[in-house]
Amino acid sequence: MSANSGVKRASKAFKTCLFCKRSHVVCDKQRPCSRCVKRDIAHLCREDDIAVPNEMPSQHESSPNDNNIQGKYANKAHTGIPSDYQNEPVNKSGSTYGEELSPKLDSSLVNDTTSLLLPQQPVFVSENVGSEFSSLNEFLSMLENPLLTQTSLSSSSASNVHLENGSQTTQSPLEYQNDNRRDEIGVARQENRSPTIMSGSSNSISKGDKQDQEKEESRILANANENSAPTPKEQFFLTAADPSTEMTPEHRLKLVINAKLEAGLLKPYNYAKGYARLQDYMDKYMNQSSKQRILKPLSTIRPAFRTIARSLKDVDLVLVEESFERMLLSYDRVFTSMSMPACLCRRTGEIYRANKEFASLVDCTVDDLRDGKLAIYELMTEESAVNFWEKYGSIAFDKGQKAVLTSCSLRTKDGIRKRPCCFSFTIRRDRYNIPICIVGNFIPLS
């Protein structure tokens, strides 16, 4: 090389060789340079012949080739279509700046330009790459989560609208990957929400099923109660309240007593409680002489009653109570048809039936005169009560006498007023000749 060329190479643009320039190091002025000699490429060491211009050409002074190249790359960068510059022959007539390129630099410059312009674009990539996998993932997610079906349908309908309007846009591979990532994130969020939604819906479904099951069970129980036969106690009340007149009174009495016996309400009466009640009343409201007069006849008849009762079995005592119930039912009809004050009481004095005339006479209700709530001696004066028990004791075991006519003085329930009456009572006996009840009739004297 000439000296003039060495002087020219003293400038900064031609100071280094081609390989030192690529490595961004400063080489010496010897050719081949010491660095290329060490790398065993002394035969390739040469200077870079590309002259660096002082000014870059302006935008308006760019060549038509530059405009074509820039337009091509800009268009392909926006559309996402892979560049086909590698299939086109390289124009060797001029460089980008209007200078000739050596054949050895063509491929390197083209590769450098390609790496700078399209660093992230794959070569020969179709715009539909991965679409089949995306469709498959979307289909599987729809099968696993039915809640996403509506979302996918709405998105597909929106895409159909864009296609019909002719506004189809082309996505680059990078944008396509970002969209797929966003779709996967949305699906993951929806799947995270779906267990809560499904658990809430399952809880509501389980609660609804439980409520329906409870309603069904209550309905079945109600139907069973309606269809089931009444209990023995209910059957007794239904039979006793039946106003049927098609059967004879004897047959009706038999039905009522049998129903009460089956209900367990027909039991032997404990007369010891009745005598204890009488004893308490005498201790509270009677003097000693009156008590002795009452206890004298009772001391005679009570041992006789006790002796007979001990010889009887429980079945016999139940039959005695059955006969008493028969008398109660028969006297209900009798008391309703008569206008004379009357009542029916046990041999211990507890009143079990009475008519409304007797209730008005002693100033109380008919219900107060039922089932032993009041006793006959509690509605009499002290002298009248003593007279009653003496008369009763005298004929209790006398089969030839069963009725007594005498006088008494009744008093109201509150004990304020007195009602003098003509009094007659009749003793009814059972099959064992034991007094079972006392029926009294009263005629007021004033």
UniProtKB/Swiss-Prot annotation:
Disruption phenotype: Sensitivity to ketoconazole. It is found in: Cytoplasm; Nucleus. Residues 178-192, 207-218 have a biased composition (Basic and acidic residues). One of its GO terms (biological process) is positive regulation of gluconeogenesis. The modification Phosphoserine is found at S102. Residues 56-70, 84-96, 160-177, 193-206 have a biased composition (Polar residues). InterPro entries: PAS-like_dom_sf, PAS_13, Zinc_cluster_trans_reg, Zn2-C6_fun-type_DNA-bd_sf, Zn2Cys6_DnaBD. SUPFAM superfamilies: PYP-like sensor domain (PAS domain), Zn2/Cys6 DNA-binding domain. It holds the Pfam family PAS_13. Phosphorylated by SNF1 in absence of glucose. The phosphorylation is required for induction of transcription of gluconeogenic genes. Present with 799 molecules/cell in log phase SD medium. This is Regulator of drug sensitivity 2.
